[in-house]
């Protein structure tokens, strides 16, 4: 199967047997990323990375979690059967939440706050390539979704500060000097956020 991302993740087409199909409105792409140093692993182009809403780093499992993984593999039960999974949301409920998110209020001062954070990535000496306007849109959407999950119909500066590292870290390319000094995209993002005055 050949997946092609066109204009955004909302416009993903699947090409199979020479036929192109537009995917449904709830079609979502989740991708894993291996270290670039691993054989056969290559960096995605910036334009493709920019189409992913967020990057979430899972980290290593705890001792208990790793023992659980070993037990499941030992019992040959490592694969979860789809029929044993219980849905937590129906398609209709998910679409309803999406419609609710559209009505989450974002004050103009917070739109400026988002834009200022993203613009900082373009002027920072630690950043070789900053975030595009698509990152601003992603940060606004992620902030609205997070506010909704917190039971609110409005976005706060704290929502923006919470989602910003996840939205920006895969979109920033650091300078060689910054990398040699031990900076990571998350660390740089946090410093840039701290530079921007929080709206009152």
What kind of region is each of these model predictions?
Residues 5, 45, 132:
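Short, conserved glycine- and acidic-residue-centered signature motifs
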Residues 30, 47-50, 54, 64-72, ...:
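Solvent-exposed alpha-helical segments within well-ordered globular domains of core cellular machineries
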């Amino acid at each position: 199967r050949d997946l092609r991302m066109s204009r955004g993740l909302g416009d993903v087409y699947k090409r199979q047997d020479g036929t192109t199909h537009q995917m449904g409105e709830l079609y979502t792409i989740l991708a894993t990323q291996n270290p670039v140093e691993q054989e056969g692993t290559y960096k995605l182009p910036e334009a493709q990375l920019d189409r992913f809403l967020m990057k979430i780093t899972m980290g290593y499992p705890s001792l208990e979690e790793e023992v659980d993984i070993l037990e499941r593999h030992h019992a040959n039960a490592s694969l979860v059967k789809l029929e044993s999974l219980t849905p937590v949301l129906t398609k209709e409920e998910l679409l309803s939440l999406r419609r609710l998110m559209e009505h989450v209020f974002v004050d103009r001062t917070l739109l400026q706050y988002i834009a200022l954070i993203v613009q900082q990535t373009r002027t920072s000496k630690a950043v070789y390539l900053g975030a595009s306007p698509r990152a601003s849109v992603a940060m606004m959407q992620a902030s609205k979704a997070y506010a909704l999950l917190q039971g609110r119909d409005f976005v706060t500066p704290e929502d923006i500060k919470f989602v910003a590292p996840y939205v920006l870290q895969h979109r920033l390319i650091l300078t060689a000097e910054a990398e040699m000094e031990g900076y990571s995209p998350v660390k740089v993002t946090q410093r840039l956020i701290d530079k921007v005055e929080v709206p009152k």
